């Protein structure tokens, strides 16, 4: 009898996500924070009929049916013992309703987690970027880089800007619980606990007061403002306009919202500072003059008439002066 009990029990490793590092401006003002949320998670190996279970939960909790094919697709590309998220940002009513019916859904649990939030919304979008749900492409890249296990309990990953560039520093180290469970999946005892290690906090060169002022100056315009400290090259403000609220990508952008951004003639998704290609215009003249003086090709008293057009020898393209008669 004891041998049978022992065989029916098994060891299970439950990963836990690390808190993502926070992002501050140069004066310690919080720019990217973590807020508590509740999600509904499913462990495929503990579910007899995954599709049926997902459909029943969607009906019971009045969830978005578009989540069904997405979760089934994720299940085909990840390990069966890793939890998959069916729904996030559950409200109190949904949490209570699931708790009453949880006995019907083995392998399904409500989990508390921290969700990224950007309190300054579209003021910092193109500088900070954003995090969003880990997709199949992300999973493949993580596996290729040997980082997949560290993301076993993580929902989001940096997609743009600072959030993407400093992903390794911000993410942290996953923790885990090693538990003994019975043949029904019930946890009998915890054998080992390794707490997660929070990601590193980042302090940017940006001054949020200057950032907000630059943002205000760009209202109703298209373009960008980049302010630098000439003493050390640090970025004080980084604004591309128009912008958008990155929080819609964190919670899961709808097809309607994304289509509106794509169709917007002002192209808010474009980072006009780092992605825009613009002719340097007259800003290149001091550079060329200094180069000429340095090489002895001209003197401080040299005068040059630019004319209405300029053509690089051996090329067909003509660059036109904004003034018809030239300078």
Whereabouts are the PLM-identified features?
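Membrane-proximal periplasmic segments of bacterial cell-envelope enzymes
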Residues: 1-187, 194-195, 220-224, 230, ...
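Hydrophobic (often cysteine-bearing) scaffold residues that line and stabilize catalytic clefts
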Residues: 20, 50, 158, 206, ...
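Active-site SXXK
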Residues: 28, 56, 98, 127, ...
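A conserved hydrophobic secondary-structure block that centers on an alpha-helix together
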Residues: 188-234
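Active-site-adjacent helix/loop patches that line small-molecule binding or acyl-intermediate pockets
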Residues: 223-239, 282-287, 291, 303-310, ...
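Short, solvent-exposed beta-strand-terminating loops
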Residues: 236-251
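Surface-exposed acidic, glycine/proline-enriched linker/cap segments
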Residues: 251-275
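Conserved catalytic neighborhood of penicillin-recognizing serine enzymes
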Residues: 267-273, 298-327
């Amino acid at each position: 009898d004891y041998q049978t009990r022992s065989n029916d029990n098994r060891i299970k490793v439950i990963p836990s996500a690390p808190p993502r590092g926070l992002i501050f401006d140069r004066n310690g003002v919080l720019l990217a924070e973590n807020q508590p949320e509740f999600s509904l998670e499913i462990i495929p190996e503990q579910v007899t009929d995954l599709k049926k279970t997902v459909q029943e939960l969607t009906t019971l909790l009045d969830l978005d049916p578009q989540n069904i094919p997405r979760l089934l697709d994720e299940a085909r590309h990840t390990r069966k013992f890793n939890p998959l998220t069916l729904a996030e940002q559950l409200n109190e009513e949904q949490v209570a309703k699931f708790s009453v019916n949880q006995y019907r859904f083995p392998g399904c649990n409500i989990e508390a987690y921290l969700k990224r939030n950007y309190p300054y919304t579209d003021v910092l979008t193109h500088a900070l970027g954003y995090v969003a749900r880990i997709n199949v492409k992300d999973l493949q890249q993580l596996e290729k880089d040997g980082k997949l296990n560290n993301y076993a309990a993580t929902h989001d990953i940096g997609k743009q800007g600072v959030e993407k560039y400093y992903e390794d520093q911000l993410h942290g180290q996953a923790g885990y619980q090693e538990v003994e469970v019975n043949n029904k999946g019930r946890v009998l005892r915890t054998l080992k606990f390794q707490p997660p290690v929070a990601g590193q906090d980042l302090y940017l060169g940006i001054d949020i007061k200057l950032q907000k002022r630059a943002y205000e100056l760009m209202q109703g315009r298209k373009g960008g403002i980049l302010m630098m400290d000439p003493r050390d090259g640090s970025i004080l403000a980084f604004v591309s306009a128009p912008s958008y609220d990155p929080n819609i990508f964190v919670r899961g952008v709808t097809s309607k919202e994304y289509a509106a951004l794509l169709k917007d003639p002002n192209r808010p998704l474009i980072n006009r500072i780092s992605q825009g290609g613009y002719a340097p215009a007259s800003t290149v003249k001091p550079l060329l003059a200094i180069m000429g003086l340095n090489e002895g090709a001209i003197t401080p008293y040299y005068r040059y008439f630019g004319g209405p057009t300029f053509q690089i020898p051996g090329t067909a393209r003509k660059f036109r002066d904004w003034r018809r008669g030239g300078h």
